[in-house]
Protein backbone atom coordinates (compact mmCIF):
# COMPACT_ATOMS: atom_id res chain seq x y z
CA UNK A 1 0.00 0.00 0.00
CA UNK A 2 2.86 2.31 0.74
CA UNK A 3 4.28 1.65 -2.71
CA UNK A 4 0.93 2.54 -4.26
CA UNK A 5 0.74 5.85 -2.37
CA UNK A 6 4.36 6.49 -3.29
CA UNK A 7 3.51 5.78 -6.95
CA UNK A 8 0.52 8.09 -6.72
CA UNK A 9 2.73 10.78 -5.19
CA UNK A 10 5.20 10.38 -8.05
CA UNK A 11 2.39 10.63 -10.58
CA UNK A 12 1.03 13.76 -8.91
CA UNK A 13 4.52 15.31 -8.85
CA UNK A 14 5.04 14.39 -12.50
CA UNK A 15 1.66 15.89 -13.38
CA UNK A 16 2.57 19.04 -11.44
CA UNK A 17 5.94 19.32 -13.25
CA UNK A 18 4.19 18.78 -16.59
CA UNK A 19 1.65 21.50 -15.77
CA UNK A 20 4.52 23.85 -14.84
CA UNK A 21 6.31 23.07 -18.11
CA UNK A 22 3.11 23.67 -20.09
CA UNK A 23 2.57 26.93 -18.19
CA UNK A 24 6.15 28.04 -18.90
CA UNK A 25 5.76 27.11 -22.55
CA UNK A 26 2.57 29.18 -22.77
CA UNK A 27 4.31 32.13 -21.11
CA UNK A 28 7.23 31.88 -23.56
CA UNK A 29 4.80 31.66 -26.46
CA UNK A 30 2.91 34.74 -25.23
CA UNK A 31 6.18 36.65 -24.77
CA UNK A 32 7.29 35.72 -28.31
CA UNK A 33 3.91 36.76 -29.73
CA UNK A 34 4.04 40.05 -27.86
CA UNK A 35 7.61 40.70 -29.02
CA UNK A 36 6.71 39.82 -32.62
CA UNK A 37 3.71 42.14 -32.45
CA UNK A 38 5.86 45.00 -31.10
CA UNK A 39 8.47 44.43 -33.82
CA UNK A 40 5.76 44.41 -36.48
CA UNK A 41 4.28 47.64 -35.12
CA UNK A 42 7.73 49.28 -35.12
CA UNK A 43 8.32 48.14 -38.70
CA UNK A 44 4.90 49.41 -39.77
CA UNK A 45 5.55 52.77 -38.12
CA UNK A 46 8.95 53.04 -39.77
CA UNK A 47 7.44 52.23 -43.19
CA UNK A 48 4.64 54.74 -42.62
CA UNK A 49 7.13 57.48 -41.72
CA UNK A 50 9.21 56.69 -44.79
CA UNK A 51 6.18 56.85 -47.10
CA UNK A 52 4.97 60.05 -45.45
CA UNK A 53 8.40 61.63 -45.96
CA UNK A 54 8.35 60.64 -49.65
CA UNK A 55 4.84 62.07 -49.99
CA UNK A 56 5.86 65.37 -48.37
CA UNK A 57 8.83 65.63 -50.74
CA UNK A 58 6.62 65.04 -53.79
CA UNK A 59 3.99 67.43 -52.46
CA UNK A 60 6.60 70.15 -51.88
CA UNK A 61 7.94 69.65 -55.40
CA UNK A 62 4.45 69.88 -56.89
CA UNK A 63 3.37 72.85 -54.80
CA UNK A 64 6.64 74.73 -55.18
CA UNK A 65 5.67 76.05 -58.59
CA UNK A 66 2.18 76.84 -57.37
CA UNK A 67 3.61 78.87 -54.48
CA UNK A 68 5.27 81.32 -56.87
CA UNK A 69 1.98 81.64 -58.76
CA UNK A 70 0.12 82.49 -55.59
CA UNK A 71 2.62 85.24 -54.69
CA UNK A 72 2.26 86.67 -58.21
CA UNK A 73 -1.54 86.63 -57.92
CA UNK A 74 -1.31 88.27 -54.50
CA UNK A 75 0.91 91.02 -55.92
CA UNK A 76 -1.48 91.69 -58.83
CA UNK A 77 -4.42 91.77 -56.43
CA UNK A 78 -2.71 94.36 -54.25
CA UNK A 79 -1.92 96.53 -57.29
CA UNK A 80 -5.54 96.39 -58.47
CA UNK A 81 -6.82 97.19 -54.97
CA UNK A 82 -4.54 100.25 -54.86
CA UNK A 83 -5.86 101.45 -58.23
CA UNK A 84 -9.49 100.93 -57.15
CA UNK A 85 -8.92 102.83 -53.91
CA UNK A 86 -7.40 105.71 -55.87
CA UNK A 87 -10.43 105.83 -58.20
CA UNK A 88 -12.72 105.70 -55.18
CA UNK A 89 -11.02 108.69 -53.53
CA UNK A 90 -11.09 110.68 -56.78
CA UNK A 91 -14.77 110.08 -57.59
CA UNK A 92 -16.38 109.82 -54.16
CA UNK A 93 -17.49 113.44 -53.83
CA UNK A 94 -18.87 113.63 -57.36
CA UNK A 95 -20.86 110.40 -56.95
CA UNK A 96 -22.29 111.56 -53.61
CA UNK A 97 -23.33 114.90 -55.12
CA UNK A 98 -25.06 113.16 -58.04
CA UNK A 99 -26.81 110.71 -55.73
CA UNK A 100 -28.05 113.48 -53.44
CA UNK A 101 -29.22 115.48 -56.44
CA UNK A 102 -31.28 112.57 -57.77
CA UNK A 103 -32.80 111.90 -54.37
CA UNK A 104 -33.49 115.46 -53.27
CA UNK A 105 -34.31 117.29 -56.52
CA UNK A 106 -37.71 115.90 -57.44
CA UNK A 107 -39.46 117.32 -60.48
CA UNK A 108 -43.07 116.16 -60.75
CA UNK A 109 -43.94 115.32 -64.34
CA UNK A 110 -46.77 113.46 -65.99
CA UNK A 111 -45.66 110.17 -67.41
CA UNK A 112 -45.68 110.04 -71.18
CA UNK A 113 -47.96 106.99 -71.25
CA UNK A 114 -50.63 108.67 -69.13
CA UNK A 115 -53.81 109.44 -71.11
CA UNK A 116 -56.31 111.96 -70.09
CA UNK A 117 -59.77 110.74 -70.96
CA UNK A 118 -62.08 113.57 -71.24
Curated annotation (Swiss-Prot):
- At which residues is N-acetylalanine found? 2
Q: Which InterPro entries does UniProt cross-reference here?
A: V-ATPase_G
Task: Output the GO biological process annotations, alphabetical, semicolon-separated.
Answer: cellular response to increased oxygen levels; intracellular iron ion homeostasis; regulation of macroautophagy; synaptic vesicle lumen acidification
Q: Does the keyword Acetylation apply?
A: yes
What superkingdom heads the lineage?
Answer: Eukaryota
Localization, per the record, is:
Apical cell membrane
- Cell division as UniProt keyword: no
Q: In which tissues is it expressed?
A: Kidney; localizes to early distal nephron, encompassing thick ascending limbs and distal convoluted tubules (at protein level). Ubiquitous.
Q: Which GO terms describe its cellular component?
A: apical plasma membrane; cytosol; extracellular exosome; extrinsic component of synaptic vesicle membrane; lysosomal membrane; plasma membrane; synaptic vesicle membrane; vacuolar proton-transporting V-type ATPase, V1 domain
Q: Which Pfam family, an example, fits this chain?
A: V-ATPase_G
Give the record's keywords alphabetically.
Acetylation, Cell membrane, Hydrogen ion transport, Ion transport, Membrane, Transport
Q: Which GO terms describe its molecular function?
A: ATP hydrolysis activity; ATPase binding; proton-transporting ATPase activity, rotational mechanism
Query: How does the record describe its quaternary structure?
Result: V-ATPase is a heteromultimeric enzyme made up of two complexes: the ATP-hydrolytic V1 complex and the proton translocation V0 complex. The V1 complex consists of three catalytic AB heterodimers that form a heterohexamer, three peripheral stalks each consisting of EG heterodimers, one central rotor including subunits D and F, and the regulatory subunits C and H. The proton translocation complex V0 consists of the proton transport subunit a, a ring of proteolipid subunits c9c'', rotary subunit d, subunits e and f, and the accessory subunits ATP6AP1/Ac45 and ATP6AP2/PRR.
User: Which family is this protein grouped under?
Assistant: Belongs to the V-ATPase G subunit family.
Q: Which PANTHER family match?
A: V-TYPE PROTON ATPASE SUBUNIT G 1, VACUOLAR ATP SYNTHASE SUBUNIT G
So what does this one do?
A: Subunit of the V1 complex of vacuolar(H+)-ATPase (V-ATPase), a multisubunit enzyme composed of a peripheral complex (V1) that hydrolyzes ATP and a membrane integral complex (V0) that translocates protons. V-ATPase is responsible for acidifying and maintaining the pH of intracellular compartments and in some cell types, is targeted to the plasma membrane, where it is responsible for acidifying the extracellular environment.
Designated name of the protein: V-type proton ATPase subunit G 1
Amino acid sequence: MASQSQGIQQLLQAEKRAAEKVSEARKRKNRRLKQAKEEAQAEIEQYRLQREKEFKAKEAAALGSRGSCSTEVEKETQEKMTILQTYFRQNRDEVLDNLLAFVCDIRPEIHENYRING
